[in-house]
Amino acid sequence: MDTIKKQKGSDDLKARALKLADLAQFQPGAIVSREILRKKTGTVTVFAFDEAEELSEHTAPFDALAFGLEGQADITISGKIHRLRAGDMIIMPADEPHAVKAVGRFKMALIMIRT
């Protein structure tokens, strides 16, 4: 679908021990994102995908690491599908087309380092 709803920022998260998966909540028919950190050198964002929600194919100018937090999703990179489950990670290379489709409800952390 590509409709992403943004939740509140990260100021309330500093110097606290928290469960990463709890930082973005599911919403029916939506993808929810919450930016945890934003610096000139990169970002950390948590996503919560409702069942069957997807980010359509796109590219990014930097490598990005996706870390499964809950559920599972199919991550397509340059036409090849990879099943990402809670506890798994995958690196999406810079400038390669990629997409994310939830298989059931799915949460992930996305870490992008700008270099």
Residue ranges and their predicted role:
Residues 94-115:
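Ligand-binding loop in jelly-roll beta-barrel domains
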Residues 48-50, 60-75:
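Short, conserved beta-strand element in jelly-roll/cupin
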Residues 79-94:
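Short acidic-glycine-tyrosine-enriched beta hairpin
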Residues 69-70, 85-86, 104:
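A cytosolic small-molecule/anion-sensing beta-strand core signal
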Residues 1-41:
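A short, N-terminal "cap"/entry segment at the start of jelly-roll beta-barrel domains
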Residues 30, 43-60:
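Conserved short histidine dyad/triad with adjacent acidic residue
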Residues 43, 72-74, 81, 97, ...:
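Structural motif
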